[in-house]
Amino acid sequence: GLGDVYKRQLKDNAVIPVLFLNTLFSSLIFLPFIVLSVWRPGILENSIFYVPVAGWEVHRYVVLKSVIVLSSWMLGYFGMKNLPITIVGPINATRPVMVLVGALVVFGERLNFYQWIGVLMAVFSFFMLSRSGKKEGIDFKHNKWIYYVVMAAVLGAVSGLYDKYLMAPADQGGIGLDRMIVQSWYNIYQLFMMGGILILLWWPKRKSTTPFHWHWCIILISIFLSAADFVYFYALSLDGAMISIVSMVRRGSVLVSFIFGAMVFREKNLKSKAVDLVLVLIGMIFLYLGSQ
């Protein structure tokens, strides 16, 4: 949630260099763990920060993870630059619903009565949210930034399902990768990908697009997102972890973004958005109850 809030501070900044710096600082956070695990394995071995050595048969899965996450990030950043955070937050809060539907199709999970209530309430709240957006001149059908945020949410859901596949043992439908391999290396792969995008796409047109200016929020975003991902991957690595529940709790970050949008950014139509947010949260609660 705090990561989303600090992203909002970069509304008038160039997206691509900001993303490049995010991946750079995130990589720098985890690079010492990789180096120590290789050169002084005794220091981190048997700790939660140890990064095992792995070959291409493992890293190819991490590269795909990097592509999915980076695509979601880019779409999300462009959308967030052009939409109120109180619109973006609840749309992102529908990710657990998409993850649950994906788990239903991909992993063969079945929805019970409470889970169906949760899904329907979340979908209904999304349509209610579109009405709140129109009060600010945002038409969900004709505003391309809405589609950016929706696609970012879809890719985020795909990423969540893929995380389940990466972390879960073979007997639970996954391949059982080490979580530190995934988080440490996918940041580094993202760094190289963003470096290429920065050089090829942004640098030649930098004078005719939104200018880049340095802000300390860029470092804070990297720290908060890295910390959130670390706890998230740790949760998924626990035996019997359910991606539908983990994803639902994670998207509780919408509370933080909504509170800051109301108190700090003074965004409009908060009463109607609050109703939509309550519907999203009630839907999440029913999903939780149905998963007990």
Show where each model-derived region lies.
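Structural motif at transmembrane-helix junctions in multi-pass transporters
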Residues: 11-17, 75-91, 172-180, 230-252
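Loop-to-transmembrane-helix transition segments
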Residues: 42-75, 144-154, 207-231
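Juxtamembrane helix-loop boundary signature in multi-pass membrane transporters
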Residues: 97-158, 164, 269-292
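Alpha-helical transmembrane segments of compact multi-pass small-molecule transporters, enriched
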Residues: 25-29, 91-105, 120, 189-193, ...
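Hydrophobic/aromatic residues within transmembrane alpha-helices
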Residues: 8-9, 18, 79, 105-111, ...
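Transmembrane alpha-helices of multi-pass small-molecule transport proteins
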Residues: 14-71, 121, 181-205, 257
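Hydrophobic/small/kink-forming positions within alpha-helical transmembrane segments
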Residues: 1, 66, 70, 97-101, ...
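Short, small-residue-biased leader/transition segments that mark boundaries at the very start
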Residues: 2-6
